[in-house]
């Protein structure tokens, strides 16, 4: 059973670095540090000293906004393109780590598409990991395990992952290089220049294009760059508010900008992403 095999070799104890083994409803290391699985199925591997607040990561409001918005299919063009990329670079019986997985929509979709790989999704938000585990359970996807941890302290064995994915999540090159196998694949998704242009134009007097990312982070070689774009029509204010709260602009916008969003009853906007595929040097 792929799932059990990989699980045993990949997650490590955040306290002592020893491999974790499943023990009933918990994970345990040789030094007897024990981590219980929550009822929904995720395991919390975030140590108290790695938290910067009592409830780090995205809060319930943000998690629910994303879950509701993505659940309506607005970003399906990206979800499908991402899953296709994972399939294209898949390794039979290999391990994929989704670092900063949020509520697991992309992780679960890829795990369904590539049943021959074992997926680990991790996020610093307990609310997000809980939503992700519930989603996997509801959809009967068993080749995935979610955990709570920071991308800056991944509780994952060095050189154990065939693939690492990072979608709109914090970047930690050192950790990503550490956990990937030699020549492992990194799949990164970022917003392209004109992503949500019409939403920005509705909110700001002088909207600006997104800054393109540097194309080759240290330690990686770019293999492929895939643009993914489409237009979406949001025909109600709830969806517009959910989309707005998923963006970094939500926290940087004046009260006037928030009022403009509240006044929109419909919005047609471009969505534009780049899928960047790298090989570890």
Q: Locations of the language-model features?
A:
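Conserved Class I S-adenosyl-L-methionine
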Residues: 8, 228-281
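Conserved SAM/SAH-binding beta-strand->alpha-helix loop
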Residues: 125-127
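Class I SAM-dependent methyltransferase Rossmann-like catalytic core
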Residues: 58-77
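N-terminal auxiliary segments of SAM/dcSAM-dependent transferases
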Residues: 2-55
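Conserved SAM-binding loop of SAM-dependent methyltransferases across substrates and taxa
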Residues: 103-115
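Conserved class I S-adenosyl-L-methionine
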Residues: 93-102
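Conserved beta-strand signature within the Rossmann-like core of class I S-adenosyl-L-methionine
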Residues: 184-191
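Conserved SAM-binding strand-loop segment of SAM-dependent methyltransferases
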Residues: 140-151
């Amino acid at each position: 059973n792929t799932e059990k095999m990989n699980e045993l070799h990949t997650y490590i104890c955040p306290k002592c670095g020893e491999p974790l083994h499943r023990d009933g409803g918990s994970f345990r290391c040789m030094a007897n540090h024990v981590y219980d699985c929550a009822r929904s199925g995720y395991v919390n591997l975030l140590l108290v000293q790695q938290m910067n607040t009592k409830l780090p990561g995205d809060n319930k409001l943000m998690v629910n906004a994303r879950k509701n918005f993505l659940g309506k299919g607005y970003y399906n063009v990206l979800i499908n393109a991402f899953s296709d990329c994972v399939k294209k670079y898949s390794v039979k019986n290999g391990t994929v780590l989704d670092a900063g997985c949020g509520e697991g929509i992309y992780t679960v979709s890829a795990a369904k598409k590539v049943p021959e790989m074992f997926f680990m999704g991790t996020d610093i938000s307990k609310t997000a990991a809980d939503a992700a585990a519930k989603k996997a359970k509801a959809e009967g996807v068993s080749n995935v395990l979610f955990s709570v941890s920071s991308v800056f302290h991944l509780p994952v064995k060095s050189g154990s992952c065939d693939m690492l994915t990072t979608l709109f999540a914090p970047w930690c090159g050192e950790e990503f290089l550490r956990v990937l196998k030699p020549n492992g694949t990194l799949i990164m998704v970022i917003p392209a220049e004109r992503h949500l242009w019409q939403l920005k134009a509705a909110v700001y007097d002088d909207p600006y294009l997104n800054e393109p990312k540097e194309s080759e982070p240290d330690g990686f070689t770019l293999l492929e760059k895939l643009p993914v774009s489409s237009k979406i029509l949001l025909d109600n204010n709830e969806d517009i508010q959910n989309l707005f709260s998923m963006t970094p602009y939500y926290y940087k916008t004046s009260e006037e900008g928030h009022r403009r969003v509240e006044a929109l009853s419909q919005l047609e906007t471009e969505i534009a992403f780049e899928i960047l595929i790298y090989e570890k040097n």
